[in-house]
Amino acid sequence: MKTEAIPINNGRNFPSRGKGLTFMLPRSPLKLLLTLTLTLTLFSPARAEDPKPLKPTPKDKCPVCGMFVAKYPDWLAQVIFKDGSHAHFDGAKDIFKYLFNLKKYNPSKKAEDIQAIYVTDYYDLSPINGREAFFVIGSDIYGPMGRELIPFQKEADARGFMKDHKGKILLKFKEVTPEIIRGLD
């Protein structure tokens, strides 16, 4: 890659700095654009963190099935909207039903309004980012609403679970479809 030294002092020499400050830029406009994009990406402030998951109260109900979710802490799932409102679920299956038919369950919201999605990791029982989770279906483990997507933060844990509990399919968040969810009912 050919580069060219470009002085940033308009070619004037500063007595204390010799020839002034210079840096190397690529000559090609495309390479220059890529260099600038990479630099801006690396040094831009990070986006705002997702809000922390909220604990359900004894009165919080799943908007899909109507169950009181606090009774099932090992299966909790949650959607948090940008305006601070939220919904709790008694498992990953119901959160997907909700997301696939948001107009039915929460007509005032759109997918773009969602700030965070949480599911509960099956092994360590902690809330994890649902969009980054691995889900196992077809296992011998059932959730509060029967057959369930079993969430994991780590792919290795999901694969180990599949071996131990006869799991059939491992999916990422974006691979879950309405047809798969209907097949679990």
Question: Can you name each region flagged by the protein language model?
Answer:
Residues 50-108:
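N-terminal secretory signal peptides
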